[in-house]
């Protein structure tokens, strides 16, 4: 595959009435997707700045993506859940010529001409448009959190997206024209893992409604109505869905492939999924936004579960060469690496290198290569110092999850005068806690055999489930707010 757009057009010509994208009761066929995106592309033609794509889980968000790619300008997805001040920061940074508002609400942009869905539907522009995108053009820019509070716009080139899509289709064992499930909002690059491999293989992209993110029963209704074949989500979202006793192979026999990315896949969750879907293909993948979604993968089997108490993230893919610094920081090199941060030379220079035409990115993740597999060992910036000891919060969390009494865990440092004074563990227990002191004692006894005393949390807070962000990741900030009152 050398071009995603040509691939989509060829499938649309051969199968015009096949459903390309579905969200609740809204659907677009491949013919509609290509026609509407062409009309949008005519309006964007000649623009040298990325289009702001505003909305949530709407089929017309996909129209916006394909239209912006055809026009060659690329897009910046902005989710409706993002705070207004952050939206303003993004628009100020991008200074777009065009904004595509896919919501029913008015959207006043600080810059750029605003189009609506109705504008495109009623447009008399031609439904044929020859794609203008080039391999080295920026296809999308996704804004991630910045340490200074200002979001950073990660620019990904078209050739990187094409290469990633090809790799995903090589991993995919389910074949073409499958029903894919996408959990992630479009401002989160995990969504790329579902969108382009699905459409490039003639599949139907099924979008999880935002109301389902913390309500697995609503997802159950969706899965019952639509026989999903391929599931793409964060591990945390899948763990929440495992609260449904009906989520198993017997109930959903069509569900035969899972892709996870965005955060660590806990061993306990993977074990439960393998048990419930013994015939399914399950992939654990790893990658930062700055390296086009994912750069490693491993198929999780019972053999892998038995061999590794902490799951590896697998081996590198084409376009990504992995290594570590002397301090253990993971470095990614190759075509998968981003073009840098939009209009932020200082931050780009801190973590990217483009010498001799080779792109490298320092991830900030600690990693090791062992037994032919890569392992992620936490974030460098998740290190804290307590009583003179430097430690990794994620190491403590990993050991907590090994306890028979712990289903899920997050460790929160408690500060006083900008100094960490002790640790608290937010715990989802495997059984109901009837005796707080006894449960605390049991968990601490488990930890004492694996961690030094100074790394053991002083106390634990019990939670029914860990809250998730709109991206489907564990919401560490909210947990800290709850614990610190």
Swiss-Prot record:
**A GO biological process held by the record:** lipoteichoic acid biosynthetic process
InterPro entries xrefs: AA_adenyl_dom, AMP-bd_C, AMP-bd_C_sf, AMP-dep_synth/lig_dom, ANL_N_sf, DltA, DltA-like
Q: Which domain of life is it from?
A: Bacteria
Q: Which UniProt keywords apply?
A: ATP-binding, Cytoplasm, Ligase, Nucleotide-binding
Catalyses: holo-[D-alanyl-carrier protein] + D-alanine + ATP = D-alanyl-[D-alanyl-carrier protein] + AMP + diphosphate
Which pathway is it part of?
Cell wall biogenesis; lipoteichoic acid biosynthesis
Q: Per the UniProt record, which EC number(s) apply here?
A: 6.2.1.54
Where in or outside the cell is it found? Cytoplasm
Residues holding D-alanine: 189, 293, 473
UniProt-annotated binding residues for ATP: 144-145, 284-289, 365, 473
Function summary: Catalyzes the first step in the D-alanylation of lipoteichoic acid (LTA), the activation of D-alanine and its transfer onto the D-alanyl carrier protein (Dcp) DltC. In an ATP-dependent two-step reaction, forms a high energy D-alanyl-AMP intermediate, followed by transfer of the D-alanyl residue as a thiol ester to the phosphopantheinyl prosthetic group of the Dcp. D-alanylation of LTA plays an important role in modulating the properties of the cell wall in Gram-positive bacteria, influencing the net charge of the cell wall.
Question: What family does this chain come from, according to its entry?
Answer: Belongs to the ATP-dependent AMP-binding enzyme family. DltA subfamily.
Q: What is this protein called?
A: D-alanine--D-alanyl carrier protein ligase
**Taxonomic lineage of the native organism:** Bacteria, Bacillati, Bacillota, Bacilli, Bacillales
């Amino acid at each position: 595959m050398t071009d995603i757009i040509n691939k989509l057009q060829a499938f649309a010509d051969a199968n015009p009435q096949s459903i390309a994208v579905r969200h609740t009761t809204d659907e677009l066929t491949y013919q509609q997707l290509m026609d509407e995106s062409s009309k949008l592309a005519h309006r964007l033609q000649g623009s040298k700045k990325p289009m702001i794509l505003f909305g949530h889980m709407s089929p017309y968000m996909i129209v916006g993506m394909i239209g912006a790619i055809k026009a060659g300008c690329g897009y910046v997805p902005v989710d409706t859940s993002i705070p207004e001040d952050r939206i303003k920061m993004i628009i100020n940074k991008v200074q777009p010529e065009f904004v595509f508002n896919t919501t029913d609400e008015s959207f006043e942009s600080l810059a750029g001409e605003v189009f609506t869905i109705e504008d495109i539907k009623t447009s008399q522009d031609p439904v044929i448009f020859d794609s203008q995108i080039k391999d080295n053009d920026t296809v999308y820019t996704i804004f991630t959190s910045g340490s200074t509070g200002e979001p950073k716009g990660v620019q990904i080139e078209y050739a990187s997206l094409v290469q990633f899509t090809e790799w995903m289709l090589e991993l995919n064992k389910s074949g073409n024209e499958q029903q894919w499930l996408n959990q992630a909002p479009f401002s989160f690059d995990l969504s790329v893992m579902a969108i382009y491999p699905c459409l490039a293989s003639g599949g139907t992209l099924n979008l999880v409604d935002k109301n389902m993110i913390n309500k697995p029963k609503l997802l159950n209704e969706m899965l019952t109505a639509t026989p999903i074949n391929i599931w793409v989500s964060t591990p945390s979202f899948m763990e929440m869905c495992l609260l449904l006793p009906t989520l198993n192979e017997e109930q959903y026999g069509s569900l035969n492939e899972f892709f996870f990315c965005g955060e660590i896949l806990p061993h306990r969750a993977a074990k439960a999924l393998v048990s419930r879907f013994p015939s399914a293909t399950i992939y654990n993948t790893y990658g930062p936004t700055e390296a086009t979604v994912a750069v490693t993968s491993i198929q999780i089997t019972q053999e892998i579960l038995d061999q590794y108490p902490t799951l590896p993230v697998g081996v590198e893919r084409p376009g990504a060469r992995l290594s570590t610094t002397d301090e253990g920081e993971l470095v990614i090199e190759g075509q998968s690496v981003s073009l840098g941060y939009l209009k932020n030379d200082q931050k780009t220079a801190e973590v990217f290198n483009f010498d001799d035409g080779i792109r490298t990115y320092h991830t900030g993740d600690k990693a090791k290569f062992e037994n032919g597999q890569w392992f992620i060992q936490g974030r460098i910036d998740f290190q804290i110092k307590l009583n003179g000891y430097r430690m990794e919060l994620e190491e403590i969390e990993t050991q907590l999850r090994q306890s028979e009494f712990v289903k899920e865990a997050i460790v929160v440092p408690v500060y006083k005068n900008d100094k960490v004074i002790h640790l608290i563990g937010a715990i989802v227990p495997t059984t109901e806690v009837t005796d707080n002191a006894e449960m605390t004692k049991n968990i601490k006894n488990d930890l004492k055999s694996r961690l030094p005393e100074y790394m053991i949390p002083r106390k634990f807070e019990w939670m029914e489930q860990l809250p998730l962000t709109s991206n489907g990741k564990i919401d560490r900030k909210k947990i800290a707010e709850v614990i610190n009152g």
